[in-house]
Amino acid sequence: MAQAMASMTGLSQGVCPAAADSRTRTAVVVVRASAEGDRCAGGPRCDRLVATASSPPLSQAVHAETVKTIKIGAPPPPSGGLPGTLNSDQTRDFDLPLKERFYLQPLPPAEAVARVKTSAQDIINLKPLIDKKAWPYVQNDLRLRASYLRYDLKTVIASKPKEEKKSLKELTGKLFSTIDDLDHAAKMKSTPEAEKYFAATKDALGDVLAKLG
């Protein structure tokens, strides 16, 4: 009973031991922080902190210097493609009609022969990719150059006299047969087959180019 009365008396007076202890700790922390601030005032460490805060960041100064030295020149020239394609940015040239932007354009026979020779050389240049076994690149480049060859050879054959068309058609048929075999070898990732049909394709290209003159 006496303990209960003592507890009630403490509560009525607003005394809480935990709260009193917390206030004491807060006071100690405040006093200690104040003492730390008094000891730092005017010291060398505080001088360095003030100097760092007042100076501009180093990255900002470097960035400002870099901006001053940047020189903007003229835009680069359009990158060139195969002869007759004008440039590789043709599909993004909005001044051209859609048909001219996304489809191969017919060329005069003389220019078609020139592009046939360029495409043939590009196919011959696939040998390093075959040696490296870069099969996706072999297939992509081979199909692209073969599409140019097929299109331009049709133009050239159509311009030839009747007696020359038959022999030229036979040579081109043999050429595209070996190109298909080379494409299949690249698809199967077979190095021996790819080397075999690359040699056959190279010979067939030589026969066609010799016929064109």
UniProtKB/Swiss-Prot annotation:
Q: Where in the cell is it found?
A: Plastid, Chloroplast thylakoid membrane
Q: What is an example of a GO molecular function annotated in this UniProt entry?
A: electron transporter, transferring electrons within the cyclic electron transport pathway of photosynthesis activity
Q: List the disulfide bonds.
A: none
Task: Give one Pfam family.
Answer: PsbQ
Q: Which domain of life is it from?
A: Eukaryota
InterPro entries in UniProt: PsbQ-like_dom_sf, PSII_PsbQ, PSII_PsbQ_pln
- For this entry, the transit peptide stretch runs 1-64
Keyword annotations for this protein, in alphabetical order, are:
Chloroplast, Membrane, Photosynthesis, Photosystem II, Plastid, Thylakoid, Transit peptide
Keyword Membrane assigned to the entry: answer is: yes
- What is one GO biological process annotated to this record? photosynthetic electron transport chain
- Give the similarity note: Belongs to the PsbQ family.
Q: What is this protein called?
A: Oxygen-evolving enhancer protein 3-2, chloroplastic
Please give the organism.
Answer: Zea mays (Maize)
